[in-house]
Structure formats: C-alpha cells, structure tokens
Amino acid sequence: MSDLYLKLVNTPVGKTAAQSLGLPSPAPLKRLKRVDQPFIEGDVLIGAGNGARAIATLGSIVGASPATLHHATGPETLAESAKTSNKAQALDITGEVSGKFSALIFDASGLQKPDELRALYDFFHPTIRKLATNGRVLVIGQDPHTCRKAPQAAAQQALEGFVRAVGKEIGKKGATANLVWIAPNAENQLDSSVRFFLSPRSAYVSGQVVRIGKADEAKATNPVAPLSGKVALV
C-alpha cells in the first residue's frame, strides 16, 4: 500500500471519503526509529489466571522499561495478577477503565482446564477497547505438548485460536496479538521474545505462536546490541 494513500486516508477529509466509499483506512504503523529506543512505553496492563508461572518474570521484564506497569484486580479469576511486581499499580477493571494501554499481557501458563479460560474473558472483555493504536496483546501459555492431562492440554491449545481471533479484531488499528508457549521451568527464557513482541520491531507480526523450551541460564546480553563482542562467519 503506497505511502500517499496511507497519508491521505489518515487526514480528516481522506478518512471521511474512505468511509463513504468503503475503502480501507489503515493506521500508520509505529516503527523502530533508533536502536536504543525503549521496547515499550506508556501504560501496560498485566493479568494472570490461576497458577500463573511467568507472572513475576513478566513483571520484571516490563519493569525494566519506561512503561507504567499496572496489574488487573477485581474478578476473582485474576487474583494471581497481584504477583506481577511490587512496582505495579493495582487497577480495578470491573469499573470504568480510563486511558489507553500500550500493551495488554496475560499469563495463562497455569490454566489446568477449559473452565479456567474464563479468566481470559474477565481480563480482555473490559480492556481490549482500551488498547491504543499500534498496541500489543501478548499471551503466555504452556506448550500443550508438555501438558500431562487432556483438560490442561485442551485449555492451552485453545489459546492459539483465541490469539488469532483477537489479532483479526485489533489489526485495523495497527495493533498485534501473539502467543508464547513455554515449556515447564522455561520462564527464565522469556526475555527476548517478550521484548520483541512488545516492541515496534514486531509491527508486521501478528497471530503467531512461538515455542520456548527449557535451557540453561545464559549470560545476559545487551538487548540493544546482542551480538556485541561476537564474531559472525558469513
């Protein structure tokens, strides 16, 4: 799609004309402007279902950014959200939610049966309309192949369809939705994937699934220059 059309339909006159003619009105995508740009800014809301295993890790990763971190409160199904971080501000989502969120993150890694998927509804139903243009939706689950019981595997597998459906709904505003499946005890490997999916680097990536396996704790790298000090043979 040409830049001229994109600029035109995002003017007041162009937007009105596009709506009258039934033409698409794509949102300008936020792109990476400098290498040291923070991976996420603005307000970020985190929620979690029963038995969430990655909630503290997610709080630590997002807490390293300039973003203002909030954790969802209100519904009983989201009680685990309070474990996000002591820096996170509690936000009751059962009332009127004001402002816009740069990202909505949900830890579903502990869900054990389909009934517990209710937590997803309780978190996203009152907040999805508050997702900002170019916002990010990220869901963390457990890889169904590592689940020991059928109900747990079914609940985790359902996350894929949910994320793809959300991605289609929010795509028109330049937002993305992605899913990360982690193996048991692989929470410490989430950092790079979370940073990527929340950043402008993932502007064209939506409805995707990434699997993360367990690995030994690696030496921390510079997220701005991860290949610094290394030699590449091409």
What residues fall within each predicted segment?
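Glycine-rich nucleotide cofactor-binding loops and adjacent beta-alpha elements
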Residues: 1-226
